[in-house]
From Swiss-Prot:
Any one annotated GO CC term: plasma membrane
Annotated EC: 2.3.1.269
One of the record's GO molecular function terms: N-acyltransferase activity
Protein name as annotated: Apolipoprotein N-acyltransferase
Active site: 267, 335, 387
Keywords: Acyltransferase, Cell inner membrane, Cell membrane, Membrane, Transferase, Transmembrane, Transmembrane helix
Biological processes, Gene Ontology terms: lipoprotein biosynthetic process
Length: 512
């Protein structure tokens, strides 16, 4: 009785919400304890039972603050190291980001208790998953979005991974919320029926993991080499280091020419404008073509626009076998989804003078088109994404083509040091390979550089913070997963049906 009385206190529930939210971080890499996702979501739902809407909103906010405060604290590393501001200000900015993201979980909990106040099957199994899908969409869309720490990613090695090629990672989010709600209902009501339904729902997708939505093409197997330059972020944009950086990448690449069909350098490996490096690029292109290899590299490009100003792009270009390199070549990719404050500054004229954090190197990029053709290198078709873009499942899928041989992502996670951020980023990249059933080539400055198989499995990788080359044979695949064909539309239809049913049934119950 004493415990029952204690748990009814709002302050205790707020504290528990913080703890359950923080527990959710364990579901993601590098911890990979996927049951933590269910425990965390179950805690969120259970703590909002029998609460008024404002109380539930506060619980949802505290839960979100626990999740994001522990799960994205890696942002502090880049702010503290490169932001040029006092320690208390750095901490405040991280707290502010976590608090902002927590508004969406607070919105979820508050609306859920406002529209479906009773602790029923309707609330946990129908209303909650649909509402969660909407609030998670808003978190990934408003102010360019930040869809980090979606619990579906915890299943990349879990029992529900087979659902990803069928309906995408967001469908796993949906099912996890439903299962967690039913478990919370079973616990609070001490009723075995919701428990049985939860177990059945959780088990149903398990056989899907054994379906192969792709066909390997062993006759097209190639040797791929990815150069991990391990250039310290503090030196990366130092003009005096440019020549040394080029030497590091060239010296690692020269022995690979004629052996590896495809060589990959990471994001902005060439830390200079493309137009300034024409002699180097043309000489390297000629050497690669002579030896039958191709190179894909990150670089910075600046083009004069119609207003007679320069647009600067975070770019991928190709060199080597095939048509000679040309600055006018369309065989390039310009990053579309830019990171706020890292690659562009909102309210630039106001914020830039305030602190060095708002004036970081290369923080004035322009956007490339949302849809861009695949890169072609040595007859290989590559659907590309730069850094942050790989976490945007729908955008990667929209750029995917049936003739894509591989997914390609290049990145520079040196901003975040030895934190958990790069591992979470890597986990999300793996999900893209699983959703689209294509091998994924991930080349980074200091890790995690890896080859991911078409079922999201790690085929080869090299350690972080080392100057190494990952060389391995990779077999392309063909075939389209249901998710590749339809995207998130089936899930949104399901969300609309669940939402409509939840509202209709709630209205009927109130009339009785």
């Amino acid at each position: 009785m004493a415990f029952a009385s204690l748990i009814e206190r709002q302050r205790i529930r707020l504290l528990l919400a913080l703890l359950f939210g923080a527990c959710g971080t364990l579901a993601f890499s590098p911890y990979d304890v996927w049951p933590a996702a269910i425990i965390s979501l179950m805690g969120l739902q259970a703590l909002t039972f029998n609460r008024r809407p404002l109380q539930s909103a506060a619980i949802g906010f505290c839960w979100g603050f626990g999740l994001f405060g522990s799960g994205i604290n890696w942002v502090y590393v880049s702010i503290a190291t490169f932001g040029g501001m006092p320690g208390p200000v750095n901490i405040f900015l991280v707290v502010l980001l976590a608090a902002y993201l927590s508004l969406y979980t607070g919105l979820f909990a508050g609306v859920l208790s406002r529209l479906w106040p009773k602790t029923t099957w309707l609330r946990v199994a129908i209303a909650a998953p649909a509402l969660w899908q909407v609030t998670e969409f808003l978190r990934g869309w408003v102010l360019t979005g930040f869809p980090w720490l979606q619990f579906g990613y915890s299943q990349i090695d879990g029992p529900l991974k087979g659902l990803a090629p069928l309906m995408g990672v967001e469908a796993i989010n949906f099912l996890l919320m439903m299962v967690s709600g039913l478990l919370a209902l079973a616990l609070v009501k001490r009723n075995w029926r919701p428990l049985v339904v939860a177990v059945v729902l959780f088990a149903l997708p398990f056989p899907l993991r054994y379906i192969r939505w792709f066909t390997p093409q062993p006759e097209k197997t190639i040797q791929v080499s990815m150069v991990q330059g391990d250039i310290p972020q503090s030196l990366k944009w130092d003009e005096g280091q440019l020549l040394n950086t080029l030497k590091i990448y060239y010296n690692a690449t020269a022995p690979l020419m004629g052996k590896s069909s495809l060589i990959i350098w990471p994001e902005s490996a060439i830390t200079d404008l493309e137009i300034n490096q024409q002699p180097f690029l043309k000489a390297l292109d000629g050497e690669l073509r002579d030896k039958g290899s191709s190179l894909v590299t990150g670089i910075v490009d600046a083009r004069l626009n119609k207003q007679n100003r320069y647009d600067t792009y975070n770019t991928i270009i190709t060199l080597g076998k095939g048509a000679p390199y040309s600055y006018e070549s369309a065989d390039r990719y310009n990053k579309n989804h830019l990171v706020p404050f890292g690659e562009f500054v909102p309210l630039e004229s106001i914020l830039r003078p305030l602190a060095p954090f708002f004036d970081l190197p290369m923080s004035s990029f322009s956007r490339g088109p949302y849809i861009q053709p695949p890169l072609s290198a040595n007859g290989i078709e590559l659907t590309a994404a730069i850094c942050y873009e790989i976490i945007l499942g729908e955008q990667v899928r929209d750029n995917f083509r049936p003739d894509t041989d591989y997914l390609l992502t290049i990145s520079n996670d040196a901003w975040f040091g030895k934190s958990i951020g790069p591992w979470q980023h890597f986990q999300m990249a793996r999900m893209r390979a699983l959703e689209l059933a294509r091998p994924l080539l991930r080349s980074t400055n200091n890790g995690i550089t890896a080859v991911i198989g078409p079922q999201g499995e790690i085929q080869a990788m090299i350690p972080q913070f080392t100057r190494e080359v990952l060389t391995t044979n990779v077999t392309p695949t063909t075939g389209l997963t249901p998710y590749a064909r339809t995207g998130n539309w089936p899930l949104w239809v399901l969300t609309a049906l669940f939402g409509f049913a939840a509202v209709l049934m709630s209205l009927r119950q109130r009339r009785k």
